[in-house]
């Protein structure tokens, strides 16, 4: 199972680096920062489906 450590999030701003991750909501996030901010917003219900685009 793929996991991402989001313990140091949320961050107020994310970089524009492109390293896509696919969330359990079937949405592609541009990078870990965007994904982790979404995880925090979802109260932990969002998880990583896999690395790369959905």
From Swiss-Prot:
UniProt-listed Gene3D superfamilies: 3.30.60.30
Tagged with keyword Glycoprotein: yes
Keywords attached to this entry: Disulfide bond, Glycoprotein, Protease inhibitor, Repeat, Secreted, Serine protease inhibitor
Main location: secreted
GO CC field: extracellular region
Glycosylation site list: 43
PROSITE patterns: KAZAL_1 (PS00282), KAZAL_2 (PS51465)
Residue ranges constituting the Kazal-like domain according to the UniProt record: 4-54
Cystine connections: 6-36, 14-33, 22-54
Location within or outside the cell: Secreted
Site (Reactive bond 3): 16-17
InterPro entries reported for this sequence: Bifunctional_prot_inhibitor, Kazal_dom, Kazal_dom_sf, Prot_inh_Kazal-m
CDD domains: KAZAL_FS (cd00104)
Tree of life domain: Eukaryota
One GO MF term: serine-type endopeptidase inhibitor activity
Domain notes: Avian ovomucoid consists of three homologous, tandem Kazal family inhibitory domains.
Protein name (Swiss-Prot/TrEMBL): Ovomucoid
Originating species: Anser anser anser (Western greylag goose)
High-level lineage: Eukaryota, Metazoa, Chordata, Craniata, Vertebrata
